[in-house]
Amino acid sequence: MALVRIGKVVRALGLKGHLGVAGSEGALGTLERVVLRHGAAEVERKVLEARPQGRLWAVRIDGVADRTGAEALVGAEVLAPREELGEAGEGRHYWGDLEGLPVVTVQGEALGTVTGLMETGAVDVLVVQGARGELLVPLAPYVEVDRAAGRVVVDPPEGLLEP
């Protein structure tokens, strides 16, 4: 079973064990089960409730009944079986589908590889490792994910690639 990273637990919400999950692109609203990866441990859990709450998803899972339990999972990756996920939609992407993709400019200059993503509140940010070191590239209109070619193409505004 191939697992895809669909988000990350970024905080506890409320007192009843809801997890604040960033980056799910709506997938959590359709899943019955998820896998949580926290450190080296992976555990599958039933999704009891999932609803949008601002830029996050408030998710309640089996086995987490209070805020303390939810706080213990902050930092955990949320994964789902690839076969249970539909397409993320036009202009939307599952985080796991972006990790590992090469990043190039529209001129063809290689910038590096997507090694991670950050949820910042306003827009998700690609973490790109390359010859220039680590670059942070916001998923803004000047970034195109070319699924057919399996790469990310950036038309960087002035200053984006400066150290």
UniProtKB/Swiss-Prot annotation:
This is Ribosome maturation factor RimM. Binds ribosomal protein uS19. It is found in: Cytoplasm. One of its GO terms (cellular component) is cytoplasm. An accessory protein needed during the final step in the assembly of 30S ribosomal subunit, possibly for assembly of the head region. Essential for efficient processing of 16S rRNA. May be needed both before and after RbfA during the maturation of 16S rRNA. It has affinity for free ribosomal 30S subunits but not for 70S ribosomes. Residues 90-161 form the PRC barrel domain. One of its GO terms (molecular function) is ribosome binding. Transmembrane segments: none annotated. Pfam families: PRC_RimM, RimM. Belongs to the RimM family. The PRC barrel domain binds ribosomal protein uS19. Gene3D superfamilies: PRC-barrel domain, RimM. One of its GO terms (biological process) is rRNA processing. The keyword rRNA processing applies. Keywords: Chaperone, Cytoplasm, Ribosome biogenesis, rRNA processing.
